[in-house]
C-alpha cells in the first residue's frame, strides 16, 4: 500500500519563519519593538552635528554591552522567508509660534501713499511690511499689523508730504455700520460702536493689501472662494458697497443734522455727499462690502479666524526601515523626495478663550502701561486702536500621537536609521521639538513557496 506524502509546504517547519535575529543575542520569535528617538545619549554624536529634531540619524541597537559606534555597524535581520510589516506609531511635540518667516506668516504687502509732494497726483507704492516673529493672540496681531503700517508712514510717507489722514490701510475689529440712521445716513450716536466683531481691513482710495504669499489672511478670517487661483489682493475698487458711514456731528445737533468732517486734531474723515442730505466717508471696509453682497462676496469668503495661519501637514519618512510605497523611490537622500510612510496635521491648534473683560483690560493697559504706540491717534474714530474681542483666539502646540498602520518592512534593518519629518512643502522644520517613533514588526505573508 502506497503511503500518502503531503506536499513539502504542509510539513515545512513554521518555527523560524517569524524569527527576528540580532547576532549577539538569541533570535526572537513573533514580535519585538524597535524604538526611534531623537537626540538620545546612545546616538553617535558626529552623525547629527548638522541635523535637527526633524531630520536625524538614530541608533536602534539597544545592546548596552556594545558601544554605540560598534552597534551602529550591526543590523537586525527579519526572516527572509517571510514578508514583514511594521506597525508605525509616532509621537510628535512642536514649539512653533504662529507668526514666523519660515511659514510666511510674518509679512504682507500693502499699497500705500508714498509721496504727496504734488497733491493733485499722489504716488502709491507697494511695500512689504514685516512684524516680529512671536506667538500672538488675534488682538495683538491686529495691533502689530497697524503698527507696521504706521511705522512705514513715519519712515516713508511723512518725509514726502503724506498726511496722517492719508494713512490708507487700517486693520480693525468694529462693525462700522452699527447705529447708522437710514434717513440721515449718519451714525447717530456720534461714535462707532466700540465692540469687536470680525477682523476687518479698511482702505482709502488707491490703497490695498496683498496676501498672495502670506498666511495672515487666514488669521484674519478672510479667504478666497477659489483657494487654488493664483494671487490674493484686496484693492479699494474691490470693496464696492463697503463705504464706512459718516458720524453725526453732535456739537451741531439738533440745530443741524450734518456729518462730522474732522476729528479734534483736525484730521479729515474724508466725508463726501453722495446725494442731497446723504453722506458717507471715502473709507471702505471689507466686512461692510462683504455683508452688502457686492463683488467681493463672489470671490472672498468670511471664515472663523485661524490664528495658527492654517498650517498644513507633516510627512514622516523612515527610508531605511520601510519599503518605499508605490510611486516613491528610495534612490534619494533629499528630504523633499524621501518616501512618505505617515502623514498628519501639523500639531499647532487654535484655541478659543472667552474673556468678558477684554475691553476693560485693554483700557486698564492703556492707562497703566506704556502702550500708546498701539493707539497713536486716540481722537480719530477710524485710526484709533480697535477694541479687543471677548473671544480670544490663541495658538497652542499640542503633542500629537498618531497610528500610521502596518506597512511593509525591509528584511534587514541597519543599526543606524534615518528619521525625517517634513512640512507641507517637504522641508525639514526647525520647530520640531521632540520626535519619537515605535515600529512593531510582524509577519504579513510567506515570501517563498516553502
UniProtKB/Swiss-Prot annotation:
Q: Which GO terms describe its cellular component?
A: host cell nucleus; T=25 icosahedral viral capsid
Which GO molecular function annotations are given, in alphabetical order? structural molecule activity
Question: What upregulates it?
Answer: Expressed in the late phase of the viral replicative cycle.
Disulphide bridges in this chain? none
Q: Where in the cell is it found?
A: Virion; Host nucleus
Pfam families linked to this entry: Adeno_Penton_B (PF01686)
Q: Which residues form a coiled coil?
A: none
GO BP: any one term: virion attachment to host cell
Going by the UniProt record, its keywords in alphabetical order are: Capsid protein, Host nucleus, Host-virus interaction, Late protein, T=25 icosahedral capsid protein, Viral attachment to host cell, Viral penetration into host cytoplasm, Virion, Virus endocytosis by host, Virus entry into host cell
The record makes one more remark, namely: All late proteins expressed from the major late promoter are produced by alternative splicing and alternative polyadenylation of the same gene giving rise to non-overlapping ORFs. A leader sequence is present in the N-terminus of all these mRNAs and is recognized by the viral shutoff protein to provide expression although conventional translation via ribosome scanning from the cap has been shut off in the host cell.
Family label:
Belongs to the adenoviridae penton family.
Describe the function of this protein.
Major capsid protein that self-associates to form penton base pentamers, each in the shape of a pentagon, situated at the 12 vertices of the pseudo T=25 capsid. Involved in virus secondary attachment to host cell after initial attachment by the fiber protein, and in endocytosis of virions. As the virus enters the host cell, penton proteins are shed concomitant with virion acidification in the endosome.
Among HAMAP family, the record links this protein to: ADV_CAPSP
Q: What is the annotated quaternary arrangement, including any partners?
A: Interacts with the fiber protein (via N-terminal tail region). Interacts with the capsid vertex protein; this interaction binds the penton base to neighboring peripentonal hexons.
**Can you name this protein?**
Penton protein
**What species was this sequence derived from?**
Snake adenovirus serotype 1
Source organism phylogeny: Viruses, Varidnaviria, Bamfordvirae, Preplasmiviricota, Tectiliviricetes
Amino acid at each position: 500500500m502506497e503511503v500518502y506524502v503531503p506536499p513539502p509546504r504542509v510539513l515545512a517547519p513554521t518555527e523560524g519563519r517569524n524569527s527576528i535575529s540580532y547576532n549577539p543575542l538569541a533570535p526572537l520569535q513573533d514580535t519585538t519593538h524597535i524604538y526611534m528617538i531623537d537626540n538620545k545619549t546612545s546616538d553617535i554624536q558626529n552623525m547629527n552635528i548638522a541635523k535637527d529634531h526633524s531630520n536625524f540619524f538614530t541608533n536602534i541597537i539597544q545592546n548596552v554591552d556594545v558601544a554605540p559606534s560598534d552597534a551602529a555597524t550591526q543590523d537586525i535581520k527579519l526572516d527572509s522567508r517571510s514578508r514583514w510589516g511594521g506597525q508605525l506609531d509616532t509621537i510628535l511635540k512642536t514649539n512653533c509660534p504662529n507668526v514666523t518667516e519660515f511659514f510666511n506668516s510674518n509679512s504682507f504687502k500693502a499699497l500705500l501713499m508714498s509721496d504727496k509732494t504734488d497733491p493733485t497726483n499722489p504716488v502709491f507704492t507697494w511695500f512689504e511690511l514685516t512684524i516680529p516673529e512671536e506667538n500672538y493672540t488675534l488682538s495683538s496681531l491686529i495691533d502689530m499689523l497697524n503698527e507696521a503700517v504706521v511705522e512705514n508712514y513715519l519712515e516713508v510717507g511723512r518725509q514726502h508730504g503724506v498726511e496722517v489722514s492719508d494713512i490708507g490701510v487700517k486693520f480693525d475689529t468694529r462693525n462700522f455700520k452699527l447705529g447708522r440712521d437710514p434717513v440721515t445716513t449718519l451714525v447717530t450716536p456720534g461714535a462707532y460702536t466700540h465692540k469687536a466683531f470680525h477682523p476687518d481691513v479698511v482702505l482709502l482710495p488707491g490703497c490695498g493689501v496683498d496676501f498672495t504669499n502670506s498666511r495672515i489672511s487666514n488669521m484674519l478670517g478672510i479667504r478666497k472662494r477659489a483657494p487654488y487661483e493664483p494671487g490674493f489682493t484686496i484693492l479699494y475698487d474691490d470693496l464696492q458697497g463697503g463705504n464706512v458711514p459718516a458720524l453725526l456731528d453732535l456739537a451741531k445737533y439738533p440745530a443741524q443734522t450734518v456729518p462730522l468732517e474732522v476729528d479734534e486734531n483736525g484730521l479729515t474723515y474724508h466725508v463726501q455727499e453722495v446725494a442731497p442730505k446723504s453722506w458717507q466717508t471715502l473709507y471702505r471696509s471689507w466686512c461692510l462690502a462683504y455683508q452688502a453682497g457686492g463683488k467681493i462676496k463672489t470671490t472672498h469668503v468670511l471664515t472663523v479666524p485661524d490664528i495658527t495661519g492654517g498650517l498644513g501637514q507633516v510627512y514622516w519618512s523612515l527610508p531605511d526601515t520601510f519599503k518605499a510605497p508605490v510611486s516613491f523611490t528610495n534612490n534619494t537622500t533629499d528630504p523633499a523626495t524621501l518616501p512618505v510612510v505617515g502623514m498628519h496635521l501639523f500639531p499647532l491648534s487654535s484655541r478659543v478663550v472667552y474673556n468678558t473683560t477684554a475691553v476693560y483690560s485693554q483700557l486698564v493697559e492703556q492707562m497703566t502701561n506704556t502702550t500708546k504706540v498701539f493707539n497713536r491717534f486716540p481722537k480719530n474714530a477710524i485710526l484709533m486702536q480697535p477694541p479687543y474681542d471677548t473671544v480670544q483666539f490663541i495658538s497652542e502646540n499640542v503633542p500629537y500621537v498618531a497610528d500610521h498602520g502596518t506597512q511593509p518592512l525591509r528584511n534587514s534593518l541597519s543599526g543606524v536609521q534615518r528619521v525625517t519629518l517634513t512640512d507641507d512643502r517637504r522641508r525639514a522644520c526647525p520647530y520640531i521639538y521632540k520626535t519619537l517613533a515605535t515600529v512593531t514588526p510582524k509577519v504579513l505573508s510567506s515570501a517563498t513557496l516553502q
